[in-house]
Amino acid sequence: MRNLKFAVLIPAYNEEKDLPHVLSRLPCEKKNIIVVDDGSNDSTAAVAAKCGVTVLRQGKNLGKGAAQRRGFEYLKDEPYDGVITIDADGQHDPALIPQFLKKARDGNYDIVVGTRVLEPGTAMPLIRLLTNLTTSLVVSLMSGQRIRDSQSGYRYLSARVIRNIPLTTSRYQTESEVLIKAGRQGYRIGEMPISTIYSGQKSNVNKFIDTMRFIGLCIKSLWG
């Protein structure tokens, strides 16, 4: 069985500090790495370009989901079997990418979600933990497939998922939207544990507004 041909997509907003370290550790050629700069106020785009990867720039900050959609649109006609999405802040270990690909290939999964396991001595902020547990339960019920970490940004998506599933959201709810739609359409969703380190950096999530957006997504999905 042949290895999967893949691209790496990194949405980035004000990540000039951590992005170079992430890019240097990716186990693939630079031509297969796409960074979407989501209207950063710092030198994120310049730093990415200096590293020799493809950079797509949003004119203003439109949200993580919008950045992912821009990347998917760019990649959907390219000759890849799938796409790895990974966050730009260094919380995810790029060395796990081969395991994502093996899981997808051996299990015939269209999506593989990285289920976060905390490193010893670190802890997920309580509000983030409770929010993730709740949203994961809701997404599991709505998608018809068990998903323990619906908010994880580290995942594999097959080419047919990014080509065939239309996404309409623009913020953090996009990661839930693709799981709900994929599950309902019969795409196979798998999971694998990933190590995660929280270094105390400030989250870009607005707890109230993004919760309202998630609720709106759920209501729309129920009637969709």
Language model region names:
Residues A7-P11, I34, R57:
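Short hydrophobic beta-strand elements that form part
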Residues Q58-D77, P94-Y172, Y198-W223:
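Acceptor/aglycone-binding surface of glycosyltransferases and processive sugar-polymer synthases
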Residues K17-H21, D42-C51:
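Acidic helix N-cap motif at the loop->helix transition within catalytic regions
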Residues D37-A45, G90:
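A conserved acidic beta->alpha catalytic loop
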